[in-house]
Amino acid sequence: MAETDPKTVQDLTSVVQTLLQQMQDKFQTMSDQIIGRIDDMSSRIDDLEKNIADLMTQAGVEELESENKIPATQKS
């Protein structure tokens, strides 16, 4: 086997470390973007739920639902 030049090993180690750091930075950036988008979607879903509840209240759906519910003891 041929001996490996220490300078070559050192250069290869440096290149691999740089590559791994770049990959870690890219994954961190993507992770931050994904978390930001999930937070944004969560806020939008909360707003939608509130708007739907408000619309149902305005339409009187809650009143209609409570009027249509008959307790099990009163059913024939």
Curated annotation (Swiss-Prot):
Keywords: Nucleus. It is found in: Nucleus. It comes from the Eukaryota. One of its GO terms (cellular component) is cytosol. Signal peptide: none annotated. Gene3D superfamilies: 1.20.5.430. One of its GO terms (biological process) is cellular heat acclimation. Its main location: nucleus. One of its GO terms (molecular function) is transcription corepressor activity. Belongs to the HSBP1 family. Homohexamer. Associates with heptad repeats of HSF1 trimers and probably also HSF1 monomers, and with HSP70. Association with HSF1 trimers and HSP70 coincides with attenuation of heat shock response and the conversion of HSF1 trimer to monomer. This is Heat shock factor-binding protein 1.
